């Protein structure tokens, strides 16, 4: 099993990063939050999980070992594969998932694309207390992002032109109707906007 990858970032996409290790470029799928912390040509360290299928080998990368361990544990639930597990961690932090399961918060779980109420109930039932208690303090209320500068930097690091990144962040903030998204939420919304523009 490949549990850790250290190397130079060669390229960053919307859902994956290419890390050069010993002259070999390894494509690693990751969440937007993990990708936002990487920079092209910079060194990185990712905790990884290798998913082996009959016709493929897919590497998933995470900012820390806890996130990787939660990714692997949620896949023990029937119907939850690696892609859905990654989507869960794109929407929730590991502690966010722990709280949702412990509190049987189905509404929080169905916010993940691909999970309905029946699937959320199954996740709560099958995981039970296996995720363990939350390791950090409860999340603070969302903090207003004044100008989205950090998110713009993250989008530029993902390969988007500065002007396009600024326009996407500005559009999300204008559509927020006075609510204050946190940085991760703003990044996800901006990525959706940019992906829609690219398809259009």
Swiss-Prot record:
The keyword Kinase does not apply. The RuvA-RuvB-RuvC complex processes Holliday junction (HJ) DNA during genetic recombination and DNA repair, while the RuvA-RuvB complex plays an important role in the rescue of blocked DNA replication forks via replication fork reversal (RFR). RuvA specifically binds to HJ cruciform DNA, conferring on it an open structure. The RuvB hexamer acts as an ATP-dependent pump, pulling dsDNA into and through the RuvAB complex. HJ branch migration allows RuvC to scan DNA until it finds its consensus sequence, where it cleaves and resolves the cruciform DNA. NCBIfam families: ruvA. Pfam families: HHH_5 (PF14520), RuvA_C (PF07499), RuvA_N (PF01330). Residues 143-200 are annotated as: Domain III. Residues 138-142 are annotated as: Flexible linker. Residues 1-63 are annotated as: Domain I. The keyword Cytoplasm applies. The gene is ruvA. GO terms for biological process: DNA recombination; DNA repair. This is Holliday junction branch migration complex subunit RuvA. The lineage of its organism: Bacteria, Bacillati, Actinomycetota, Actinomycetes, Micrococcales.
């Amino acid at each position: 099993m490949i549990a850790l990858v250290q190397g130079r970032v060669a390229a960053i996409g919307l859902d994956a990063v290419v890390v050069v290790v010993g002259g070999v470029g390894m494509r690693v799928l990751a969440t937007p939050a993990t990708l936002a912390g990487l920079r092209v040509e910079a060194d990185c360290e990712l905790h990884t999980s290798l998913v082996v299928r009959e016709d493929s080998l897919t590497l998933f990368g995470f900012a820390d070992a806890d996130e990787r361990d939660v990714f692997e544990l949620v896949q023990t639930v029937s119907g939850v594969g690696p892609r859905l597990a990654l989507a869960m961690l794109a929407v929730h932090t590991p502690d966010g998932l722990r709280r949702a399961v412990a509190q049987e918060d189905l509404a929080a779980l169905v916010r993940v694309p691909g999970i309905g109420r029946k699937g959320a109930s199954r996740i709560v039932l099958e995981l039970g207390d296996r995720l363990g208690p939350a390791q950090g303090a409860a999340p603070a209320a969302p903090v207003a992002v004044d100008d989205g500068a950090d998110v713009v930097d993250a989008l530029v690091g993902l390969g988007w032109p500065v002007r396009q990144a600024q326009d996407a962040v500005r559009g999300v903030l204008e559509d927020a109707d006075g609510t204050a998204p946190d940085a991760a939420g703003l990044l996800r919304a901006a990525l959706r906007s940019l992906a829609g523009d690219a398809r259009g």
